[in-house]
């Protein structure tokens, strides 16, 4: 379970998050939505333990993330940051294993190699395994980064705008794979993802956390929380949720 209790974050005296309290259990996809500057990335980094709250607590499976040591945090969450930076000379295989090997001084163990093989299989990366990152398309590269996060074998995947540079086809491919990984089974993970595309949130999210100006607007199951009225208030423009061909679609009104 992820639990935030009265969490506020300030930067240079300016409030970024203001008195956020919410909780949700494992399973499914939780989408963080809201306008630019709402505090979504800061909230995700606070959950990962990389941003310490000015006040309040963040707990993941009972662990106080601000007080925990990095190895303790790494057993609970894997964060894929928006500006993830690694050398372009890495191969896909090396990238996927990078998050595991870094925990024990770069020396892979048999369990690490097995996990990398599983990740390459699950994300259909075997044909690209020995290719360098600078030889990949944007969609292939992002799929490799998500596989790297999955291979860290944590119950929670925290993804900061992983679709931002992708065309609709590659974005849909990533989300289809994430959706499949949240279903029960040995590969199951729980996903918390920052999304700007409301249509993607409407289609894939099980839960919605909506932020505006650093404050929590609503949090809950998508079918209850993601309403046209809430979206219009959140973004300051007329939006509605319509059912089209069996899917919820966000449309302007």
Regions found by a protein language model. Name each.
Residues 48:
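Helix-to-loop junction immediately C-terminal to a conserved catalytic motif
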Residues 33-35:
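The feature captures the beta-strand-to-loop junction immediately N-terminal to the Walker
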Residues 56-64, 73:
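Conserved ABC transporter NBD signature motif
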Residues 2, 17-19:
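Conserved structural motif at the start of ABC-family nucleotide-binding domains
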Residues 97, 110-128, 153:
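Conserved ABC ATPase "signature" region
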Residues 157-161, 166:
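Catalytic Walker B motif of ABC-type/P-loop ATPase nucleotide-binding domains
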Residues 132-136:
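Conserved ABC ATPase signature
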């Amino acid at each position: 379970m992820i639990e935030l209790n009265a969490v506020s974050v300030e930067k240079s005296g300016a409030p970024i998050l203001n008195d956020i309290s919410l909780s949700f259990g494992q399973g499914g996809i939780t989408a963080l939505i809201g306008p630019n500057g709402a505090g979504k990335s800061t909230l995700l980094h606070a959950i990962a333990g990389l941003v310490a709250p000015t006040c309040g607590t963040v707990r993941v499976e009972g662990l106080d993330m601000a007080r925990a040591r990095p190895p303790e945090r790494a057993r609970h969450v894997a964060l894929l940051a928006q500006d993830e930076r690694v050398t372009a000379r890495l191969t896909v295989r090396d990238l996927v294993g990078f998050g595991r090997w870094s925990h024990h001084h770069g020396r892979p163990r048999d369990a690490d190699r097995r996990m990398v093989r599983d990740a390459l299989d699950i994300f259909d990366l075997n044909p690209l395994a020995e290719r360098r990152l600078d030889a990949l398309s944007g969609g292939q590269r992002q799929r490799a980064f998500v596989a790297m996060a999955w291979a860290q074998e944590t119950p929670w995947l925290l993804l900061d705008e992983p679709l931002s540079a992708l065309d609709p086809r590659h974005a849909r491919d990533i989300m289809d794979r994430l959706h499949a990984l949240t279903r029960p089974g040995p590969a199951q993970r729980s996903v918390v993802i920052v999304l700007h595309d409301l249509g993607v949130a409407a289609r894939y999210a099980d839960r919605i956390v909506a932020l505006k100006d650093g404050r929590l607007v609503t949090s809950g199951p998508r079918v209850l929380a993601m309403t046209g009225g809430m979206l219009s208030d959140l973004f300051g423009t007329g939006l509605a949720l319509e059912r089209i061909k069996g899917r919820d679609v966000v449309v302007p009104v």
